[in-house]
Amino acid sequence: MVSKEVEKLLLKVQKPGRYVGGELNEVIKDKRKVDVRFAFCFPDTYEVGMSHLGMKILYSLFNSVDYIWCERVFAPWIDMEELMRERQIPLYALESGDPVSDFDFIGFTLQYELSYTNMLNMLKMSNVPIYSRDRTELKNIVVAGGPCACNPEPIADFVDMFFIGEGEEVDLEVMELFRECRAEGRCKLEFLERCAQIEGVYVPSLYEVSYNDDGTIAAFTPKGNAPAVIHKRLMKKMDESFYPDNFVVPLVEIVHDRAVQEIFRGCIRGCRFCQAGFIYRPVREKSPEVINEQCKKLCMNTGYDEVSLSSLSSSDYSQIVPLLEKLTSWCGEEKVSISLPSLRVDGFTDEIMNKIKTVRKSGLTFAPEAGSQRMRDVINKNVQHDELMQTCATAFAGGWTTVKLYFMIGLPTETMDDVADIAHLGQSVVDTYYQTPNRSKGKSVRVTVSASSFVPKPFTPFQWEPQDTIPVLREKQAHIKESITTKKITFNYHDADTSFLEAVFARGDRKLAKAMALACERDFHFDGWSDCFDLQKWLDIFEECGIDPAFYANRRRSFDEILPWDHIDYGVSKQFLIKECRKAYNNTTTPHCRLQCSGCGAAKYGEGVCFEKRQNLV
């Protein structure tokens, strides 16, 4: 539902369907009959936000509670934003059309550090003060979660509370407490102090941060009864976890326009650069029976003809073949294709391939991450060259002719020879295609090589490592391009400038807040979009604020330095991460969790693969 003022703008903007709501399966409630109104804000465009599984789950979860009405808010694209500012139209929610400032909670899911300026811009467009200290009443409570909550410090001055870990349970606990506090006439501070006692809730205003003369952190000091360490929340029984039986079906084409079914959380592998592989430990699976039934309901209620099996590594699902047997038993008849978007090189077997082929072939994507075997050992990828070639040969024999390969440059200990091996590996895949006798005849192979830049992230063994400087990253990108000698390989790479700013925010502290506030004042937004990003403008702001961004991005930390996220516990011990970092420099790999428990600390949750492994050893 949109106002007449908004309607007048729709013919003047790209994709007006982004801004009107009214989609199939949206939830409409009588706002006079609910106690809590939650504006679920995704700090990017409609197409990106509507593709996000976490938003789909929490939107349905909140709205399954009678007294909560959760509505969606997305960042308007530049053309719409300009018109809204000109006509002084505040940011609004799609379902009711009401201004965001009318809501009790303004919640953000933070998937990417470069969305921080969008978060602040959305508050600004809502006429809501960006600083937490300036929002004094028990309304417009700004909350945030998602992987960027691993290090909440750069935006700690703006957010009232962060949800640490998985949100299905803690979110509702906070909503219920809010309802109670408002009925009792409590103030905002009293509400926040009580929220801080809930496991998985971090209230930044209840902590003092002091610094050493060299700019590093001296101490985090909790105020009052705030806990010294905030422990993450997680769902232990995935079969019992909430999952929607329908999704809001978008009016415009979105990035991932299909049904998405989560099959497990966590990852058994432990790639040393991968934040998700550590913060979502331990691995917890859904049963094939539950997954199959949920897929049926989703496809029936949304009309989608593709279902994507979502996880960090779908082929590591322990019952992948029985699951595919169940799915293909009805997907073929219903003309529903099955997508496995996160396949490991060593997980694409003949059996899996044949199951997928019976429905409809979708694209294949693999992530070797490094071109040389030495570098794959450094990052603990545990994938051999011959395995990759055999996997590609299997795919080519099965009728596939396009393969996407994801790599990362700038990793610790990397040399130019390692970088050139990325191009060489792509060439080996091309050669394998023409060496496969039973490939599709009369077709050419297309290999896409994509190289992102290493960004050191919290709660990984590489969290202490420096990022390569921008000139070095550009040199490595050019070296790959020069090393590719065939037009059958397409080379894509991430902009080094944006990766640099991502690294600044990923390992930043509260001193960055003044730079972000100044960026908001100057209308920065969509930093993750290359046509909107201007590094020089950021460097100017950092200089004005007396901040050296290289201090955060390009500096190696010592193991005994207090890190901005050290007061948060994601279940993996710092001692384990240090041990893994040292093993990387010795080119030593660590077995995955099903082969051996490496003692990361996640077994303490009493659930998941690592706990099962330890139980079997007793």
What is each model feature region?
Residues 2-28, 32, 38-40, 485-618:
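Radical SAM enzyme core and accessory elements
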Residues 9-39, 46-47, 204, 210, ...:
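N-terminal [4Fe-4S]-dependent radical SAM core
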Residues 38-44, 62, 249-275, 299, ...:
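N-terminal pre-triad scaffold of radical SAM enzymes
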Residues 41, 45, 296-404, 408-448, ...:
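Conserved SAM/AdoMet-binding glycine-rich loop
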Residues 52, 253-289, 596-617:
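Canonical Radical SAM [4Fe-4S] cluster-binding loop centered on the CxxxCxxC motif
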Residues 76-222, 461-509, 517-531:
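Glycine-rich beta-alpha loop elements in corrinoid/cobalamin-binding modules
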